[in-house]
């Protein structure tokens, strides 16, 4: 099977933001694979034997559900609530699945099949299901979804989005926001405008 890059990663010898390539016996700054899904980098010291022992059984069970509690899940929820802005927490396995879950909740709450999902231009919310539909114009997504069904969901600049939300609340099921836009480049949105949108 052909890969995009001719690199064979050695995960044991990779560290921080650097991947070690077995083919060339060199390390490379990883600017593609793990910048958002592995923010602590490869082989961070926090992932020691005690961490591995505690997390091992949970990773085998995929403890990402909201149907029942366990001591481990209760501990995690309490720790997470210390940094969360909201009392209610719903966990999902990936960011793309979290987007889908949030949109399903919005549609069920709104009960209006014609209601739109609004997004900020250049935002990327995953390729699963509805995630890509929030802004299919991003170059890395556009060619992949050109033959997919289209929708009337809109994407605006942050300023235009604020105006649209103010004037058209009844037509909106959800507004989905990516505060730091990585896929379209490092675009950091104005925190004050995000608060105004909220």
Positions of PLM-derived features:
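Glycine-rich loop-to-alpha-helix module at the N-terminal edge of alpha/beta enzyme cores
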Residues: 7-8, 27-111
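PLP-dependent aspartate aminotransferase-fold enzymes
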Residues: 75-176
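Catalytic PLP-binding core of fold-type I/II PLP enzymes
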Residues: 187-198
């Amino acid at each position: 099977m052909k890969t995009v890059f001719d690199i064979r990663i050695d995960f044991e010898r990779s560290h921080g933001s650097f991947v070690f390539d077995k083919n060339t016996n060199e390390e490379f700054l990883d600017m593609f694979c793990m910048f958002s899904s592995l923010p602590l980098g490869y082989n961070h010291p926090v992932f020691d034997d005690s961490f591995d022992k505690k997390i091992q059984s949970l990773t085998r069970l995929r403890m990402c559900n909201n149907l029942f509690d366990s001591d481990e899940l209760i501990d995690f929820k309490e720790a997470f609530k210390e940094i969360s802005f909201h009392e209610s927490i719903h966990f999902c396995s990936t960011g793309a699945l979290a987007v889908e879950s949030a949109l399903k909740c919005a549609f069920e709450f709104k009960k209006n099949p014609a209601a739109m999902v609004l997004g900020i231009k250049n935002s990327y919310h995953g390729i699963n299901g509805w995630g890509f539909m929030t802004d299919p114009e991003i170059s890395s997504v556009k060619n992949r979804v050109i033959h997919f069904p289209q929708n009337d969901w809109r994407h605006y600049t942050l300023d235009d989005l604020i105006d649209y939300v103010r004037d058209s609340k009844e037509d909106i099921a959800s507004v989905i926001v990516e505060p730091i836009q990585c896929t379209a480049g490092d675009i950091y949105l104005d925190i004050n405008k995000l608060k105004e949108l909220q």
